[in-house]
């Protein structure tokens, strides 16, 4: 390792301090190198001081308080006993997770190693309560917190059997108060911000949300915000939150983004999504009480929102069929100049039968051939043509008035035309004969009347 290689393993602030010293006193570099090597060789011992060996048996005479058979979720998942006791080595308080009297995880020097502890409600399970204990960093690395679940009925029964509370007591707050006092005796504090009997300066609450694909609970406490309880569990000091913003607001949900002042390794922005709209007022009141800056209307977010809305509305920017038709009529000037295709594919036009506003000329043709086909229609179900004519009249009456108005504006009206149809403008009808084959025997059997080729 070269002279300054070890500096790259240190925080930048510490690197700068060491470089300033070594510039003034070059011989000190060797001392810093030795100190770094010593720290590496003894880092395992530092961690071991926080834990007892897995086969350490706890003397019952050293137990201050114990809670049997609780569900531990972190740092290990197991049914264990929570025990506050004195160390058999230095007789200082320790917190241990124990199975059959043997410690599987233990924290010593609780006053220095425990950052905070709190009771938290379990959403939709009023008979359960979380105990969350956050540990301080070791070598700038976050440690998994202690998280366990207590069953209120079981704890009440256990406390009564140990004589810690009276048999008539059913208030679980009596149990939490006793546990808090035992924790204070061993060097750390456990908060109970959701205790309804104690007025809080900042009301605590929790909301359901998602972080990415992980569903969890966001707890807003007087001094901290916790997201759990799937790893990594996130803990934010409210004083370390620079600003907050709201986004993706819908009728039912919205998103919240917390922006931290200092990057602690996770990043500075944390977005929580799918929060119920009914929770907005609680979060907004919390933000105002903590004097956190609301960045929802920042220029950056407004630009992102505008860009997102533009992308979502790209399809609406495309001209609709009605707009295309209007443009075509304005360009060509007169609907009579629009070419008619005699081989129009009716099957390809999905709206042909339901939404057609124009006659296909069959009425004119029927008028021209009415006298010639009158006797044939009477012999072969003459009601056919009459019913067809009545259906055309119904369709005309139900035609979209908006389209009628549109066409009347863009097409000159010819009131004197004898061929004026539904919209009172001339329609040039192609003059050609359509051969009609009459097969009396088949028509009588099928009742079809007339066949069109």
UniProtKB/Swiss-Prot annotation:
Residues 316-334, 397-420 have a biased composition (Polar residues). Signal peptide: none annotated. Keywords: Chaperone, Chromosome, DNA-binding, Nucleus, Transcription, Transcription regulation. Residues 304-315 have a biased composition (Low complexity). Residues 340-395 have a biased composition (Acidic residues). Pfam families: PH_18, Rtt106_N, Rttp106-like_middle. GO terms for biological process: DNA replication-dependent chromatin assembly; heterochromatin formation; negative regulation of transcription by RNA polymerase II; transcription elongation by RNA polymerase II. GO terms for cellular component: chromosome; nucleus. It is found in: Nucleus; Chromosome. Residues 299-426 are annotated as: Disordered. Gene3D superfamilies: 2.30.29.120, Pleckstrin-homology domain (PH domain)/Phosphotyrosine-binding domain (PTB), RTT106-like. One of its GO terms (molecular function) is double-stranded DNA binding. Histones H3 and H4 chaperone involved in the nucleosome formation and heterochromatin silencing. Required for the deposition of H3K56ac-carrying H3-H4 complex onto newly-replicated DNA. Plays a role in the transcriptional regulation of the cell-cycle dependent histone genes by creating a repressive structure at the core histone gene promoter. Interacts with histones H3 and H4. Belongs to the RTT106 family. This is Histone chaperone RTT106. It comes from Candida glabrata (strain ATCC 2001 / BCRC 20586 / JCM 3761 / NBRC 0622 / NRRL Y-65 / CBS 138) (Yeast). The gene is RTT106.
